[in-house]
């Protein structure tokens, strides 16, 4: 089943992106490099609750 997740910037802690993930395939927390409009650059975003 696909579940809603929120991606949080690791530097400024802003929650910038929402997405879905399949819990059966991805049990770990997702980490992606995405653009943060508050930092004005690409930063690592981690899955948060």
Swiss-Prot record:
Q: Which domain of life is it from?
A: Bacteria
Gene3D superfamilies in the record: Ribosomal protein L33
Q: Which UniProt keywords apply?
A: Ribonucleoprotein, Ribosomal protein
Q: Which InterPro entries match?
A: Ribosomal_bL33, Ribosomal_bL33_sf, Ribosomal_zn-bd
Task: Kindly give the SUPFAM superfamilies that the UniProt entry links to this protein.
Answer: Zn-binding ribosomal proteins
Q: Where are the transmembrane segments?
A: none
Molecular function GO terms recorded: structural constituent of ribosome
One Pfam family of this chain:
Ribosomal_L33
Q: What processes does the entry annotate via GO biological process terms?
A: translation
- Entry's Gene Ontology cellular component terms: cytoplasm; ribonucleoprotein complex; ribosome
Q: What family name appears in the similarity comment?
A: Belongs to the bacterial ribosomal protein bL33 family.
Among PANTHER family, the record links this protein to: 50S RIBOSOMAL PROTEIN L33, CHLOROPLASTIC, LARGE RIBOSOMAL SUBUNIT PROTEIN BL33C
Instruction: Specify the protein name.
Output: Large ribosomal subunit protein bL33
